[in-house]
């Protein structure tokens, strides 16, 4: 099975993957249908990352979620402006540019595990609904790093809205 996704989105999501050996199943990015998901058990990043799957059998159904470790070196390669997409074949991770040239390659096997039920953690919110969030300095640093990757270094802003006791206040 082949998994292909957007390099920038994967780099941003991978910042949230775990590092603890005791929770080895969090030490990678989970590809679940069109989503890339990573968590360290405290912070979770979910993104529609342009995930597509290749198979010898073109009629094959979308596979079960697969968890792939993403190294710091791979994340660095994905953050380069020339990086376009990433291809993972179960044994190797390759970062490509728009022309199809390989920018980075590393051996990496998928993690044989069951990834946590991330859909049960992410609240469903109607588009116009206000929602609340609380942020620690560690989380804000990771959010800033994620936003920097996604914006290409451009200045960004975050707006927090809320009107109840649990909402962020000005």
Language-model segment annotations:
Residues 1-170:
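DNA polymerase processivity clamps
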């Amino acid at each position: 099975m082949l998994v292909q996704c957007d390099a920038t989105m994967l780099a941003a999501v991978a910042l949230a993957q775990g590092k603890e050996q005791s929770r080895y199943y969090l030490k990678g990015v989970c590809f679940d249908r069109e989503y890339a998901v990573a968590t360290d058990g405290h912070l979770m990043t979910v993104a529609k990352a342009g995930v597509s799957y290749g198979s010898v059998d073109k009629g094959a159904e979308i596979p079960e979620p697969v968890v792939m470790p993403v190294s710091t070196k791979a994340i660095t390669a994905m953050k380069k402006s020339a990086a376009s997409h990433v291809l993972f074949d179960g044994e190797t991770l390759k970062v490509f540019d728009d022309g199809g040239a390989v920018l980075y390659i590393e051996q990496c096997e998928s993690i044989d595990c069951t990834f946590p039920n991330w859909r049960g953690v992410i609240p469903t919110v109607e588009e116009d609904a206000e929602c609340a969030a609380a942020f620690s300095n560690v989380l804000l640093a990771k959010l800033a790093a994620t936003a920097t990757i996604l914006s290409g270094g451009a200045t960004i802003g975050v707006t927090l809205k809320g009107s109840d006791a649990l909402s962020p206040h000005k």
